């Protein structure tokens, strides 16, 4: 190429990159490519281009595959299954993102790389992590990106019937499932290879690679894709255009290489990040939302492409080798979670899954395992396949749907799958409803869980079907873990938009597909294409959450086989709905385990209000699920609590979906989600709720099912209110909403800081599941509801509070009454505040201590794991705390005062950190405040920084090793407080109550800081006082015997002691002063005395300021009596001369937390 051409290409590439960056900033629209149509650069080969060509093959070779993308063969190839395995093997977290990305990449890979798959696979094994992934992802993804998506979907849909037929066979083999449409034989061959060993799973993964060298890379890309799904895909779709332009382009794509640089550099980083799952988890979750929408479309194509790619069995060995290297460590890591998971879900159907997770679980459920035991070995491999197929969960979903259509053939594999399917299904519905809440957290966790589950599956899972379950269980577990890894706020934030988008699709899928899964295999298969895309979206979004829903479909098929519970689900739902209701209410961590099914039912109800089938079908398996869940409650409760909260919502819907075939699955996700601490409380809570609600649960579930659409926008609050109100049927009806609300609070607690945004997104997401049409309004309503719960929108809150208060009154007389009242309160509290949950728990605990315990658990999650520790440390403690708090909050809960119900008590860490730790935190908060534009919010953040600066000074003061004095820290903090108070003048005519409350907090901080400054220098001040007093006496005596020097001294000192001098000796002193002034020009005050006087005045003035400012704060606080009375009650009042810095810090933080809640600033 001549220079001009290259310059033109460079310009174009720059434009593309700019476009990509802009698109990355905006949520990448799924349909719009990051780059313009790819072009091929024909120029002499260089190392990079030659390596790319060797990896991806010639464009001519790939051209045919690109053209044949729509061919069913490609669809039939189970390659998508393989990429997931590779992804799973790579890493749990990596797996999550890779799942999303790998779906896309797998879909893309079949397009171009198939011919060169073996070569590219071999090289890919070497370059898999870095170069290869870039090229392969770019080449195969680009080739298949635009057309691949459509073709894959079309081929997938076209092969829907065939895939269903073969899907049954494929259900046995996850690969066949993922590629259910086209190649059962290829799948079986792959399956057989899988059954050979985990290496077979690796093999399948390699096979995917061989099919599309880009696939492994696609997996690599998937992380970056997850962030840039559309952008990356565009970039990868870029290669197809390049291919079309010329075959040589692959050899040296100048533009191709450059775009790849951006994406690929991102991908390798992501892959490394994936491998370092923790570090990558956050970025992944953040990136996932933007990429999820794109992933949806991309995922669908990946299924057919993956299927075609899996055709190359010869490359499997190479790929297997690659897989083996990358997989073993992840498998090990995943196995541990798996073992934990199984204990959580001891269900026969899930036994295979559980067996994957842990032998203990398998033994626990030996009956199912007898059939699953032998399957377990093959299933481990199949599970790995499933993991990869989970990557293309949409494909799996279709395949699974097919198996459902043919439950008979799928029956045996289905049983194993049913476990996986239940889990996946639970996750699916939970992802529909709970996913909205746990959105990206769930996704990242789900994906990591999937990878983990797949790996455990390899170790001890039945055939392909358990792996999806394991994935699900692991996904749940991972979700729990990942949210922690990923800052809940960031993950939630990123998830909120994407989750909402997903929820639309997820809702459509969840209501349509999820319901189809639940209601019947036939429905699922028909809905599979749409569901696949949506599922894929959610899968990418939720890392494995949505993909799991396809897996769930598989398991659902098995479930159907088990009890044809999907069709019966509706029927059973009526009977079991009560349990669902019970479980829902107890869904708050305390009852999560036992009420997991119900919680999921509730979640399902929320998410699937449109499709009552889903709820009903979910509820049908609840009885067994309930029992099993009770068993696993302790285990699950032992699991991280935060996990429970995020996943509880997801597990709620999931459980409702998967409960019928195996309540075990819901249990598993729940137990994963449920931390140890809430278990005791949860169990008790669940038992209480069961007793109270079991009779009415059916009505409850049914009523929510029928009612949700009508009140759906306000359903969360209204339902809670109704539940609180009516002890009988009405109560039951409202209970599911409570579950929803509880799920929302749990989510909120999980992401206390991102509560507002997440609540809106979560509620919106669930609502989206219920009603796509109402999605926007619903998401708004959740926000308003959250705000209302915060007390800012008292109208809806008051309505619900009135209803809940009335219900509470009604319920209080009856044993069930207290629980419902508590639940509504708790729900309100959690809604109003993540931390408010504890206060709401208190109020709810008034009616039911156990319930309050569960609420407290959720609130603790929001508060921090510290609270969880406290809650878990003893349910009794929780109960005791609940009563005490209930004494504070019970009136507020019934009244639903905007302040009390939403006012939750923060849980403070008693550990002592270094001064640097607090200093860094303070600086971070201050910088955050500097960037804000809203003056009130800025002031709140500044005061928050002030509190951290005070903590820093306190640490300096307490730590003997600290050489620095805290005095400068306190002194500068006072200056910051003064600046903060200038932002919002409480005397201004437009000053609000919040402004005045904030001012009182500022004044009290300032006053106690002045007092502290005085006390730090008090010893010096006493010395100065003695010295100055002596000097003044001497100067006074000297002034009486006039002498210029003494006179001048007397003149210098009189002002401090002027009161003493003026009364008795005013005449003499005056004369002395006058004489001194007359002759004083030559007389000087000793410099030492002058300095002492200045220092003395400065130190004592601190005390004067402290008293004056304290009085000012006390006067102003009288205007905000309710707020500060409640704050004093919760935290203990601040006492001017007795409160220490720690008391001030906690008091102020609690007040700031409530101010944020009132102002809806909590995110």
From Swiss-Prot:
Gene3D superfamilies xrefs: 6.10.250.2670
Signal sequence, start to end: none
Localization, UniProt: Nucleus; Chromosome
Modified residues (Phosphotyrosine): 712
Site, Breakpoint for insertion to form KMT2A/MLL1-AFF4 fusion protein: residue positions: 350-351
Modified residues (N6-acetyllysine): 822
The protein, known as: AF4/FMR2 family member 4
Organism: Homo sapiens (Human)
